[in-house]
Amino acid sequence: MLIHPEINPVALQLGPLAIHWYGLTYLAAFGLFFFLASLRLRHEPYASITGPGAWSRRDIEDILFLGVMGVVIGGRLGYCLFYKPGYYLTHPLEIFAVWQGGMSFHGGMLGVLVSQWWFARSRQRPWLQVMDFIAPCVPTGLAAGRVGNFINGELWGRFSAPDLPWGMVFAHSGSMLPRHPSQVYQFLMEGLLLFVLLWLYARKPRKMGQVSGAFLVGYGVFRFIAEFFREPDDFLGILALGMSMGQWLCVPMIAAGIWLWIWASNRTSRR
């Protein structure tokens, strides 16, 4: 049995300014995205895509800027709407209290979809071409976010078997019984494993929409599995059919990914 180290969430204190580890993981996520997107720009199929114009470093900068806006706004609104709609309907001003925590991946994903639709429209590019470009660069950012969750000792897992070698006690959970370190599970599955699989899959020319479909299915499946080990939000608990809110949100995501991949596979054009 392991004990969570209870790391100070503040990485650096500069007078009244507190720099949190969680904020640094967000910076790491955006930095990794820019690095990986730059690598993608040098390789097929994007190195040879010229219509309606060659891809450039400026494109990546704009994609990242709009993506950050989509993640923050969509993630916050998604949390408020998916997890605590009743509370935020009666306390609407607290939607802006982002320092209190509360972000949703599924909401952030919707925010990114909208922001990249705007980018694609402004560049007169196919929206799916843009999404296929960025999809393999996303999992490392998810991995960085799970590192932040672990450092904060939040989003811990359900109770594990007492003899599980990596079972971990999280002091903030209110119990001294070992739990699954679900943040680590998600780091490995939604972060590293999904990144490797998607990066390798996307290195070969694919029909437009296939990479995006593969991402939706891959993330949805890994998140669905991880939810069996993650402690449900105490204000929601387990919902219909014994599934958590995270799992219910993954169901349409997986279905959409399967549909998109099949639809893209039946297309005659790769772009």
UniProtKB/Swiss-Prot annotation:
Gene name per UniProt: lgt
Main location: membrane
Role according to the record: Catalyzes the transfer of the diacylglyceryl group from phosphatidylglycerol to the sulfhydryl group of the N-terminal cysteine of a prolipoprotein, the first step in the formation of mature lipoproteins.
The protein's name: Phosphatidylglycerol--prolipoprotein diacylglyceryl transferase
KW Transmembrane (keyword) present: yes
Source species of the chain: Polaromonas naphthalenivorans (strain CJ2)
Pfam families to which the protein is assigned, alphabetical: LGT
Any one cellular-component term (Gene Ontology): plasma membrane
Top-level taxon of the source organism: Bacteria
EC number: 2.5.1.145
Binding, a 1,2-diacyl-sn-glycero-3-phospho-(1'-sn-glycerol): R146
GO process annotations (BP): lipoprotein biosynthetic process
Keywords assigned: Cell inner membrane, Cell membrane, Membrane, Transferase, Transmembrane, Transmembrane helix
GO molecular function terms noted in the UniProt entry: phosphatidylglycerol-prolipoprotein diacylglyceryl transferase activity
Database matches in InterPro entries: Lgt
Keyword Membrane: yes
Membrane topology listed for this record: Multi-pass membrane protein
Pathway(s): Protein modification; lipoprotein biosynthesis (diacylglyceryl transfer)
Phylogenetic classification of the source organism: Bacteria, Pseudomonadati, Pseudomonadota, Betaproteobacteria, Burkholderiales
